[in-house]
Curated annotation (Swiss-Prot):
This is Transient receptor potential cation channel subfamily M member 1. Residues 1-25, 64-95, 450-490, 618-641, 822-856, 1354-1383, 1389-1408, 1567-1622 are annotated as: Disordered. Homodimer. Interacts with TRPM3; the interaction results in the formation of a heteromultimeric cation channel complex that are functionally different from the homomeric channels. Interacts with GPR179. Associates with both guanine nucleotide-binding proteins G(o) and beta-gamma G protein dimer; implicated in directly regulating TRPM1 channel open-state. It comes from Mus musculus (Mouse). GO terms for biological process: calcium ion import across plasma membrane; cellular response to light stimulus; G protein-coupled glutamate receptor signaling pathway; protein localization; protein tetramerization; retinal rod cell development; signal transduction; visual perception.
Amino acid sequence: MGSMRKMSSSFKRGSIKSSTSGSQKGQKAWIEKTFCKRECIFVIPSTKDPNRCCCGQLTNQHIPPLPSGAPSTTGEDTKQADTQSGKWSVSKHTQSYPTDSYGILEFQGGGYSNKAMYIRVSYDTKPDSLLHLMVKDWQLELPKLLISVHGGLQSFEMQPKLKQVFGKGLIKAAMTTGAWIFTGGVSTGVVSHVGDALKDHSSKSRGRLCAIGIAPWGMVENKEDLIGKDVTRVYQTMSNPLSKLSVLNNSHTHFILADNGTLGKYGAEVKLRRQLEKHISLQKINTRLGQGVPVVGLVVEGGPNVVSIVLEYLKEDPPVPVVVCDGSGRASDILSFAHKYCDEGGVINESLRDQLLVTIQKTFNYSKSQSYQLFAIIMECMKKKELVTVFRMGSEGQQDVEMAILTALLKGTNASAPDQLSLALAWNRVDIARSQIFVFGPHWPPLGSLAPPVDTKATEKEKKPPTATTKGRGKGKGKKKGKVKEEVEEETDPRKLELLNWVNALEQAMLDALVLDRVDFVKLLIENGVNMQHFLTIPRLEELYNTRLGPPNTLHLLVRDVKKSNLPPDYHISLIDIGLVLEYLMGGAYRCNYTRKSFRTLYNNLFGPKRPKALKLLGMEDDEPPAKGKKKKKKKKEEEIDIDVDDPAVSRFQYPFHELMVWAVLMKRQKMAVFLWQRGEECMAKALVACKLYKAMAHESSESELVDDISQDLDNNSKDFGQLAVELLDQSYKHDEQVAMKLLTYELKNWSNSTCLKLAVAAKHRDFIAHTCSQMLLTDMWMGRLRMRKNPGLKVIMGILIPPTILFLEFRTYDDFSYQTSKENEDGKEKEEENVDANADAGSRKGDEENEHKKQRSIPIGTKICEFYNAPIVKFWFYTISYLGYLLLFNYVILVRMDGWPSPQEWIVISYIVSLALEKIREILMSEPGKLSQKIKVWLQEYWNITDLVAISMFMVGAILRLQSQPYMGYGRVIYCVDIILWYIRVLDIFGVNKYLGPYVMMIGKMMIDMLYFVVIMLVVLMSFGVARQAILHPEEKPSWKLARNIFYMPYWMIYGEVFADQIDLYAMEINPPCGENLYDEEGKRLPPCIPGAWLTPALMACYLLVANILLVNLLIAVFNNTFFEVKSISNQVWKFQRYQLIMTFHDRPVLPPPMIILSHIYIIIMRLSGRCRKKREGDQEERDRGLKLFLSDEELKKLHEFEEQCVQEHFREKEDEQQSSSDERIRVTSERVENMSMRLEEINERENFMKTSLQTVDLRLSQLEELSGRMVSALENLAGIDRSDLIQARSRASSECEATYLLRQSSINSADGYSLYRYHFNGEELLFEEPALSTSPGTAFRKKTYSFRVKDEDAKSHLDQPSNLHHTPGPSPPATPGRSRLALEGPLSTELRPGSDPGISAGEFDPRADFKSTEAAPSLNAAGVTGTQLTVESTDSHPLRESKLVRYYPGDPNTYKTMKSRSFVYTEGRKLVRGLSNWSAEYSSIMDQAWNATEWRCQVQRITRSRSTDIPYIVSEAASQDELEDEHRGSLLDPQISRSALTVSDRPEKENLLSVKPHQTLGFPCLRSRSLHGRPRSAEPAPSKLDRAGHASSTSNLAVMSVVPEGQNTQQEKRSAETEC
């Protein structure tokens, strides 16, 4: 960290020095000063090329050394250079220069252009400088994981399925954890596969992963294009096939090019890369988590150097876990094999040890000593087997590479469970935490699985203040205050102490998950035993409010607005500040618990006296009425004494999910808020509170001119919570109507003693109020105890006007009420029971149908009258009738002549207004808020209250003036006349009770607001015309207030159609006098001069009327129309919402209307005074609200909460079922099932292929046994003395040199089921290397295999009886095409053979990695006058799981043969040429028919069908050989005098004489790569469309074609065969 500070300070100094380009130029100077390149300055000629230096560059490309001194060297390198002065070294022969290559790359040549940042640095650059560059200049965030990919440098093929799984897993691991990927950078080997995965990801998603390529500068193709300082360079990704250099991979985002002065050599990047990885691992993931950045190595394929890298990783301190991708080839497969069969200590049994040594030798073409060295390194790696994780595609427990990487990190680092949890939390991988950490579920983990040391925790516990964490530990076992000492004694138990540490780790993880907004982790931790009531304390909640992590929020701005002062950036937000913010956002009479006196006292005791001083500045020291003398002070002292700061329960919350949900809402964490809303009690109230808070925050953000998206997002969040509240209400209403109504009206002690209905009204949630449950509740409340179904208004009016009709109305009992408080219910029930008991003795009951009438009769007359007048509907009509009477009297007063003293009618009006004013004062004083100022503020938020205030104030002023003498009495009367307008407008409030008129009242209010904006626009147009017109027509006006009137007077009336035609043009009308300069009228009087510009007035007026009358007025109409339809669509909800306000208003009003309401006021005062006296005597609590509120006991409240939680669970269960039954979900599930089925089918196909291969192996072994038995029979015949000449024609057999020891059973690649293949393996002594190219070729070389057969000419002129061999003969003869070899059968025609001659068949096998030429063998014998002919069959040799290319047969020119009869020869690749079709069992093959007559022999190609097993050499049975001998013998007896040489052989042109073998369709893996631990991988080459099936090249026999032809003809035949296209 010190070096980081030095770099940052040097960077600052550079930026200060640059005065022209600021920080960019300073950063550029810092880069050039810090980073260097390396150049070779001494030429040491190479032994291979004298024109080239040992560094790889040409001698003329070197630059001279700096004159300042010798090149920079370091200690160890210098000593090495001195001791080995003859060798070239980086330290001695290179010099450092400031880097000249850094900037931005633009890749060209691909499908699309990517950009990447790059820099050329020296191989010994300090890693802290590189990290500073990456974080500060490249603007990269520190990773939470570092994946270092290692593998083969040369290009190799991966199985398509494995490549897909590898790419997806790597990308997913990097995406979900925010990882960096380190690779070699150049587009070869494993880097190309990583680049393909990155390319697929970047094409499917917008963001690019951070892939950093660390490549050697000397191996980069086109590196000259990169030279430049802070430049943007175009880079071509097309590589030169003749160059040894490699291009950079265009899928990477950053490149670090390590330079050690060499060219064309790897190794410069190894040390730099390892040091940089080590330095990054020392960095912390974030400030909250103490974990360093974890590093993991990913091995794909690779050579011996990869094994050394793995060992280096495992020996690091701390060790780096390694993930090996099995099935990718070479080093990865060897490591996987060793990991599978090694014991924990790195011990392997002898048989597997020998097999592994042979595998290493064959794979890397190593000698025995080299293979032993590499084997030792592998065994050293296996000593730390637990750090190596092998990914096998398809194996159980490993779905993808991503899980293997993250699991390896958790297990390999040997970290404790809390540290592993921190890593999983940093990666945001809840699946890893669930499967690897919480393996025991909610149960406690076993002893020893939790690793944090005890001592450090204990010391921290002693040093830390009494924070939430330490308090949490105290309550972890549920102890009380008096048992603290016992708790300390119990901590000596290691098990309990370990569990206590685990609890603390879980709580810390919960805090981190909340801060980092990890909803899934919060859910996981709650499921696994985190007690939220134990977890959440006051300090922790404050820490959550003050966090800077997570999504951005506007809480700081809200606190600043509430405190009305500028806050410092590091201001610590307290819970009391949060309480003020909540009260500000909720509005109305809402009172937060954080601002109550009890909480402030607790807060003061916990945190000292500093923060309450801030409360006094805010005026929050006391919200209750002033204290009464000494008693209040004593109570306050007692409260302070009772609070025990050391008790952990004091600083905790009763409902922690309430507090956390409010925190999530204020911090704008919607997903977290929704999750916390589901947990805990009072879900409906929480949803309504969140809806109100979000809506208020959206309003604040829109007024603060923040980004519109913020306000829109907050508004959407508000709608989401509002919808949740409605859905929950609907769910509970479906289950139980009565309990649902209780949910709406019960008292919410945690939410300012409010109710759900009040919270919905505060949030203006119309849909909630318009719900059926809410409306039923309001209807019950509106009707009181009256039971009226039809014409309730008419019945109520009749009851008011004719009181005796009240006795005929129906009333309800208290059992039918759904809104009354429990106290009122009990009182009413007691009264009814008393009445029933009193009337019970009067008579007996007659039947069930009379019960209702008896109940009605049981209600006394006084109760009926009282309940009638207390019903809100009766109060409404009573007040309405009274108000209409008042308006009639007011009309009469102002319409008739007003005397000096008020008339009786006027006194009634005055008394009405005065009593109404007293009622408004009563409303203010009896409202919910505590402070008088807050009461007035809340009261003024209602529009009609403002109207009443203005109207009453005007009337009072008018009444005072009216009582005075003239002229003040006249002024008072005028005020009366204006004031009655407001009282008429007040009638609109009465219309709100009507379903049809109510929405229109709201429309009028909205249209008035729209019209205010329109008036502003109209004012601009009106003034522009009015001022111009007035100035033109009246240029000589004197200053006067009439000017302002004249500006607006005429233009305003023109809007309504009054155009003042006589004043449009002053001189066009006859009524206006003429004017002119130096002109006189008829009487000789001088005319007045004309007003200049008067002709402009008509034109201006035309434009004005066009804009004002047509444009603006129609615009206003359109706005009104839009408002109308907007309100009309929600008219039902609007009316129901207004109905609530009306019902609540009349529910709380006294029974008598003004002016008789003064009697009700006197009654209320008397009851209040008597109630206070009774309280003093009995010590009762405060009087509870008389509103729509239900007071429940603790037991009833608990049952109600349980019902609400059940409804929440049922609601989400229904939503989940609905989502699963949706079409999109069904399509997704079907797609997953189809994909799983396809994978299963692929596995079945692989198993079937394995079974086929196994059957082939069995067939091969059987054929070998059969051949051995044939040899034994032959040996026995020789021993028995049977004549050898009789058996010459019988059979020719190919000998098999493959013994049983060469058949090794190996595990199939990428298979978890242990599939096996049996393959041929040959000793090294059997390999024939006759060319240097072949001897240096790694992998499987040509295998020598001898096949013996016999050729005999039955003619007396030529007779041959000797074996021939199948062997590879390299030479300069005409080449065969790659992938083919030629099989030549030659036979001498001379009866005199040279000693040691070996006529036979020449064949060449090929290796796909080695270039070679296989040619025909030269004729073995050439006698004078006699030449030999040859039958050439060209074929492709292959191994198991290889595709065969083409098989052709090239006969020579027509020859004369002498033969006996027709015979069919069957040839297939990998099988003998046999006669007959008796034992043939292949799938596809060809038949070469030879038709004989006296003069010619013709060849014909046909196709036959065979069943299976094309890859096993077919061995002729003894029975078939015997039949062949008999046919030969019978043929010779038919015409013994005719020799074969006398017959003519001619080609059949229509058949083209081709021997074609079709490809094998079902057997093997045609697209996969065949691998063996004992050989190099063999990749399947693309076969042409004409190419045929896969098969084995094995042996040939029974080829006997002899002729006597001229020598020239034979040469011509060879020429044609060589020129033929293969």
